């Protein structure tokens, strides 16, 4: 569990530096093995309190110490390792832990439903084990992380790993301690109290040369009592802990230093040596000889008692809570320094508070097992959920059995117990007599509670008998005519509460009692639906309070089946099941467990067809919400894994976070939920410890991913909504304003890189407006956004200028009507001519048939020619409305002017783009020539704007054609874009606003020019008629 996990969360194949060039003797090896056996077999042997720390003095060796970076790879084979401590830890701790873990993984694979995957992984393990018994490749493969995590969640395996670890390190420390005669072995740290304050202590750490490396200060904090929740739901009170000011930078003297501080118990005292765990900081000698913080070692998982920087760290180990001597703020500061020094964080449970001072000796120093590189501590503010903290002024009351509580408040309990000594029927008779005699409903409920307590505490009954008696008591309560309806509800709920508080009944048996009680209630004819629902909800509450997830799942499944099989109407069944779902939804369970329970309820309910469509939709909404929350949590965990991976550069981090963003956008969640997740992503990136430029690069990638995402799966309004959320995450981050400005620019750059439209860019401003920051910060971020937009538009202007070079905008001259009609006749006759040409193929039939076919073809030509000539004659008549070329040109110029004038009435870019599409591209009633002339004129005239008298005033609506400065037609070789920019230089915003319009016009021109026209085919004439 700890002792072999790497920083990226994978099993590490490296362990620690060699200690000395010394082999185990047979006697030493036998001593170690015997010590471990004795430790694992002992029960309650008294242990001494763990010392606060040790000092290890380096010994002199001729060989230099291997660097930590060299040890981050695979462990050398046993034959290449002569260090006795390395061998001891490998053989007694690391390898046994790995063996146990693999054994559990194989068990989990055997139960896996995907048999192909299970067999693949099983073979992978077996094949690798033949090559390398440490399975370093398997443990180092990220694809195997889910199997490792699942195995580590097994309670029995956790116990085994903790036992192996504690026993192994205890034996190593005992064997290699100074007290055991080992040269340079472990010695206690000497803390000295401050004269002025009893809660302050200090110690000076020196290297071998006697030079001071640093002074450590320890502060004992006595705080207002607060409680921490353990994994099993129980709470522990904390009122005292300590903080140690671990140094970040060391520049006094040369050498190395290793600080390992013992974790304190919940009451602020030190644990016994056999239960001690540690927080360790490793300072390795840097290039300049000064110590650098390279590693952090701590038990896993590391949690913090709050969200502030002063929140103290704590862990749960062996079912107990221990506080560590580091705060959240100090931990973040240390982790940043570790990353800066390219070190790695590791997870170890040490056996003593240890300070290892190493001097500037050219000979090999002595290094302890505390230098092992094992499981990593992920940044806890992201990796681990902080459990609820409940401040209290009162000490926690000791847990007592229900029997003891009842004896204090209920003097008649002895009577019910006496009644039960005869038979269950005697007890029921006693209870019923009391319910008849007693009018006060509170006393009636107390009597029912007494009976339930007597049943569960009856030592003469086994579990089956207790269960049967509880069911009989519940049925008696429901059917008792002397109880009012509300008293029946309170009486059954009292029975359920008694079941909950009983310390002797196993959880699964409690689950059966709850299920049976619900069955009695739902099938009773003496209760209304409202009262049944109240009792059902109480039973669900009790079931969800059980200590293990298997019992909770069994209870909910059981109650669900009871509802479906009950004699309730279909409508009432649906109501009851919705009540079960609501209780699960509002419980304190994790989202993952809620998701599992609700999914199970919904599936069974749909199969049984007891939920109405509206009820199904309601439960599905609850499930979707929980799924979205779990997805958000999982997504941010992945983002943090990427951000804190010291082995990946900014480009790789950007690519990986872009992939996560794309997965979110493709997911089934609503746009609002997707926006919330994207906001968390950008907020997490912005708040990370990366450099500002790196964060801006990652944010740019997120913006580009959103802008380029498929419009079919994500509509434009939804893209804008999500982009606004992305900017809100940046704006509301806790990083400084200049960094946020840089990241806002990065987001805008990403939008332009992804060819996002104006709606997407405007969404950035919307995100700023909706963020919870002050007005001055909003203004600064908007300026940053505008600056990025302006820079992007400048690039577009330059690209447009380059794109226009070499293009020739020619005037398209319309043909007159006569030419067009003649061309139409030619095009119609051509197919007939082609058919006639085919008749010239080699003659294969009789002469008469050839004459007949030729006559038919000529007849078709004659009819078609007559039809076209008549049409031409009608057109040439006085009523034919025939227009000359000059008239046609004048009409075209007029139509072009009308279109240009209509275009000028459109004030916004969106309206102008719509006009181009509707009137120039889609309107085929206008001739191709008119539309192309309109586009050419708009391209020439659109870019001219009259200079504004006041140069400081810039608006996007200034579109007055200048009469003083005219732009020459764009030539083929040198388009005069630069001149246009000079003419309206004081209103550059106008040009930039029209860049998109110019692009739209050129795009429309290309579309019109590519429209398919019937190509004319010249009539082929033969020199002589066909041969007969």
UniProtKB/Swiss-Prot annotation:
<protein>
    <recommendedName>
        <fullName>Antigenic heat-stable 120 kDa protein</fullName>
    </recommendedName>
</protein>
<keyword id="KW-0963">Cytoplasm</keyword>
<dbReference type="Pfam" id="PF12574">
    <property type="entry name" value="120_Rick_ant"/>
</dbReference>
<feature type="compositionally biased region" description="Polar residues">
    <location>
        <begin position="391"/>
        <end position="400"/>
    </location>
</feature>
<dbReference type="GO" id="GO:0005737">
    <property type="term" value="C:cytoplasm"/>
</dbReference>
<feature type="compositionally biased region" description="Polar residues">
    <location>
        <begin position="359"/>
        <end position="384"/>
    </location>
</feature>
<feature type="region of interest" description="Disordered">
    <location>
        <begin position="359"/>
        <end position="405"/>
    </location>
</feature>
<dbReference type="InterPro" id="IPR020954">
    <property type="entry name" value="Rickettsia_antigen_120kDa"/>
</dbReference>
């Amino acid at each position: 569990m700890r002792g072999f996990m790497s920083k990226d969360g994978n099993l590490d194949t490296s362990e620690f530096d060699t200690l000395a060039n010394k082999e185990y003797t047979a006697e030493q090896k036998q001593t170690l093995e015997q010590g471990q056996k004795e430790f694992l077999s002992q029960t309650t042997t008294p242990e001494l309190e763990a010392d606060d720390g040790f000092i290890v003095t380096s010994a002199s060796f001729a060989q230099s110490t291997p660097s930590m970076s060299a040890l981050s790879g695979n462990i050398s084979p046993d034959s290449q390792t002569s260090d006795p401590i390395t061998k001891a830890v490998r053989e007694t701790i690391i390898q046994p832990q790995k063996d146990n873990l693999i054994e559990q993984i194989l068990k989990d694979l055997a139960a896996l439903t995907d048999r192909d995957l299970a067999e693949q992984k099983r073979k992978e393990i077996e094949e690798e084990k033949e090559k390398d018994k440490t399975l370093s490749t398997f443990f180092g493969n990220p694809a195997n992380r889910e199997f490792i995590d699942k195995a580590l969640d097994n309670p029995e395996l956790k116990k085994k790993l903790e036992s192996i670890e504690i026993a192994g390190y205890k034996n190593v420390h005992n064997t290699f301690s100074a007290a055991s005669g080992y040269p340079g072995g472990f010695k206690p740290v000497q803390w000295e109290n401050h004269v002025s304050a009893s809660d302050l202590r200090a110690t000076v750490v020196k290297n071998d040369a006697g030079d001071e490396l640093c002074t450590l200060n320890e502060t004992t904090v006595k705080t207002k009592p607060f409680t921490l929740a353990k994994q099993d739901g129980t709470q522990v009170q904390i009122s005292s802990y300590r903080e140690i000011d671990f140094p970040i930078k060391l520049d006094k003297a040369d050498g190395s230093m290793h600080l390992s501080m013992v974790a304190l118990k919940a009451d602020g005292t030190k644990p016994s040596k056999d239960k001690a765990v540690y927080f360790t900081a490793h300072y390795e000698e840097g290039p300049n000889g000064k110590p650098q913080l390279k590693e952090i070692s701590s038990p896993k998982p590391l949690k913090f008692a709050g969200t502030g920087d002063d929140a103290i760290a704590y862990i749960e180990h062996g079912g107990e809570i221990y506080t560590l001597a580091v705060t959240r703020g100090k931990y973040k500061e240390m982790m940043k320094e570790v990353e800066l020094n390219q070190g790695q964080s590791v997870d170890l449970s040490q056996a003593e508070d240890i300070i290892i001072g190493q001097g500037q000796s050219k000979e090999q120093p002595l290094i302890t097992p505390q230098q092992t590189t094992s499981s990593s501590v992920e940044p806890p503010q992201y990796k681990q959920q902080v459990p609820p903290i409940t401040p209290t002024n009162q000490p926690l009351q000791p847990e007592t059995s229900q029997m003891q509580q009842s004896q204090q408040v209920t003097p008649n309990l002895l009577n019910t117990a006496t009644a039960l000594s005869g038979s269950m029927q005697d007890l029921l008779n006693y209870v019923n007599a009391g319910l008849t005699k007693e009018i006060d409903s509170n006393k009636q409920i107390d009597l029912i509670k007494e009976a339930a307590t007597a049943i569960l505490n009856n030592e003469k009954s086994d579990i089956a008998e207790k269960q049967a008696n509880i069911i009989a008591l519940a049925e008696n309560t429901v059917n008792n005519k002397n109880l009012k309806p509300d008293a029946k509800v309170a009486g059954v709920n009292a029975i359920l509460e008694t079941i909950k508080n009983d310390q002797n009944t196993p959880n699964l048996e409690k689950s059966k009692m709850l299920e049976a009680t619900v069955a009695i209630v739902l099938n009773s004819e003496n209760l209304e639906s409202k009262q049944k629902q109240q009792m059902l909800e109480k039973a669900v509450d009790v079931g969800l309070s059980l200590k293990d997830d298997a019992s909770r799942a069994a209870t909910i499944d059981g109650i669900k089946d009871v509802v479906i099989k009950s004699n309730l109407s279909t409508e009432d069944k649906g109501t009851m099941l919705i009540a079960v779902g609501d209780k699960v939804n509002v419980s304190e369970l994790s989202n993952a467990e809620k998701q599992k329970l609700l999914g199970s309820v919904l599936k069974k309910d749909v199969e049984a067809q007891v939920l109405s469509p509206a009820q199904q939709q309601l439960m599905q909404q609850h499930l979707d919400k929980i799924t979205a929350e779990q997805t958000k949590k999982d997504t941010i965990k992945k983002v943090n894994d990427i951000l804190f991976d010291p082995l990946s550069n900014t480009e790789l981090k950007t690519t990986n976070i872009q992939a996560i963003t794309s997965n979110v956008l493709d997911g089934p969640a609503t746009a609002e939920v997707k926006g919330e997740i994207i906001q968390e992503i950008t907020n997490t990136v912005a708040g990370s410890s990366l450099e500002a430029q790196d964060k801006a690069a990652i944010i740019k990638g997120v913006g580009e991913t959103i802008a380029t995402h498929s419009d079919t799966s994500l509509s434009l309004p939804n893209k804008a909504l999500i982009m606004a959320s992305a900017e809100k995450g940046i704006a509301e981050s806790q990083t400084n304003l200049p960094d946020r400005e840089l990241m806002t620019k990065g987001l805008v750059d990403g939008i332009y890189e992804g060819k996002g439209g104006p709606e997407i860019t405007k969404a950035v401003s919307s995100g700023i407006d909706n963020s919870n920051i002050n007005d001055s910060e909003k203004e600064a971020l908007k300026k940053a956004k505008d600056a990025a937009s302006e820079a992007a538009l400048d690039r577009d202007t330059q690209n447009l200028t380059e794109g226009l070079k070499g293009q020739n905008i020619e005037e398209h001259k319309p043909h007159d009507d006569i030419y067009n009609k003649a061309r139409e006749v030619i095009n119609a006759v051509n197919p007939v001519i082609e058919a006639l040409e085919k008749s010239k193929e080699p003659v294969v039939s009789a002469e008469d048939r050839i004459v007949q076919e030729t006559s038919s073809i000529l007849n078709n030509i004659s009819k078609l020619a007559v039809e076209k000539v008549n049409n031409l004659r009608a057109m040439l008549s006085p009523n034919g409305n025939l227009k000359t070329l000059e008239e046609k040109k004048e009409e075209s110029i007029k139509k072009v002017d009308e279109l240009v004038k209509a275009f000028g009435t459109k004030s916004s870019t969106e309206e102008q783009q719509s006009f181009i599409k509707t009137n120039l591209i889609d309107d085929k009633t206008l001739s191709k020539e008119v539309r192309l002339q309109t586009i050419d004129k708009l391209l020439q005239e659109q870019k001219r704007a009259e200079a504004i008298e006041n140069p400081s005033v810039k608006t996007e609506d200034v579109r007055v054609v200048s009469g003083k400065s005219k732009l020459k037609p764009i030539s083929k070789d040198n388009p005069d874009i630069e001149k246009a920019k000079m003419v309206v230089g004081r209103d550059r915003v106008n040009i930039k606003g029209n860049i998109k319009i110019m692009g739209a016009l050129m795009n429309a021109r290309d579309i019109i020019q590519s429209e398919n026209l019937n190509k004319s085919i010249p009539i082929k004439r033969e020199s002589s008629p066909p041969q007969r």
